[in-house]
Amino acid sequence: MRSAFAVLFLALIAITYSKNYEDVKEEIKNEVENEILKDLEEDVNEFDDNVQEEVNDARPLRRFFRRIRGRKLLPYVPTAIKLWNLGKK
């Protein structure tokens, strides 16, 4: 009878330890993920700073054209073509 209680007691300890182990494992995993994300954010910020410096080094006219993006002008292209054709007729 004592051996049965000993086995049950050891099984209870093993189950308790395994749940705690899983919790600790999950916490470590979350901490590692957070550290990786922080490092990536720092790298992205450094990259953005470097790009901004390169843009500021360009000539003023080139900076002006870089600010004008194709996406901003794209909706106006069909209207410009119609006006161009209208002016030719």
UniProtKB/Swiss-Prot annotation:
Protein origin, superkingdom: Eukaryota
Job of this protein: Antimicrobial peptide with a broad-spectrum antimicrobial activity. Keeps its antibacterial activity under a wide range of salt concentrations that mimic physiological conditions of human blood, which is surprising, since Hydra is an obligate freshwater animal with nearly no salt tolerance. Does not affect red blood cells.
Residues that make up the propeptide removed upon maturation: 19-58
Subcellular location: Secreted; Target cell membrane
Protein name per Swiss-Prot or TrEMBL: Arminin 7591
UniProt keywords, alphabetically: Amidation, Antibiotic, Antimicrobial, Immunity, Innate immunity, Membrane, Secreted, Signal, Target cell membrane, Target membrane
Family stated for the protein in its record: Belongs to the arminin family.
Modified residues (Leucine amide): L86
Species per Swiss-Prot/TrEMBL record: Hydra vulgaris (Hydra)
Annotated tissue distribution: Expressed in entodermal epithelium along the body column.
Segment forming the signal sequence: 1-18
An example Gene Ontology CC term for this record: extracellular region
